[in-house]
Amino acid sequence: MNQATALMAPSDARLKFRNGLVTPTSGWSDGYTQANLIAVAADYADEFIEFCRLNPKACPVIDIIPAGRHESVLAAGSDIRSDVPAYRIWVDGELADEVTDATSVWRDDMVGVLIGCSFTFEAALASEGIPLRHTETGRNVPMYRTNIECTPAGRIHGPMVVSMRPMLPGLVDTAIRVTSEVPKVHGSPVHVGSPEDLGIADINRPDFGDAVEIRPGEVPVFWACGVTPQSAVMASRPSFAISHAPGHMFITDVPESNYREPAGVSL
């Protein structure tokens, strides 16, 4: 882990991304809340927000930026069109482009939704001795589309996406305890063990992000992931949408501790 990026103030990180730095944000600005982004035209916004409400494990909303505004209340002076390291542009449900600044393609009627990200709790996992293989090896976290269908909302539907972190079985209970305290960044895992149970045919071929080594004796642990709205875009095919590129998050000024709740969620 890079100590300089781990200790960087969120505002400084956002400025670097605004100036063109492209990098996954796992390990950046430890202790602060990171967020996934999905932005859609106003005529789809209510349905997307309802989709998130109905699927809070995968899509815990932490801010909604209405049409005509670009600053999140969670980050003073921010601009959600430029302060993410990389964006994906979707046309009719197909990935049309990936850009480092979405200002020129952002439409006046677009509503932005920020969804809590599991990168937020990684420093807490690491402090308990739980490995973060993707961070240790300089890779993006692996993410997979699953056979778990989210609850639909109007025209919006699609399968849950999960992120995966391998660990020894003896650490699983600790991981559950630590992450269950932060439901606004996905909370406790949705599955431990066999990836086939989630419809994942080859764990070494993630749908998003990078594959990581699962060492002898380790088990894969899966958390619901905020790339799920992108899966919904692919399935529902709205005419236009903008998202973060998987693993490249919006870093807020909000301490992770602000979202911490008493533990009590378990598999």
UniProtKB/Swiss-Prot annotation:
Keyword Transmembrane helix: no
Keyword vocabulary terms for this entry: Lyase
Pfam families assigned to the protein according to its UniProt record, in alphabetical order: D-Glu_cyclase
EC number from the UniProt entry: 4.2.1.-
Top class in the EC scheme: lyase
GO molecular function annotation: lyase activity
Listed HAMAP family: Hydro_lyase
Assigned protein family: Belongs to the D-glutamate cyclase family.
Protein name, per record: Putative hydro-lyase Arth_3576
Organism of this sequence: Arthrobacter sp. (strain FB24)
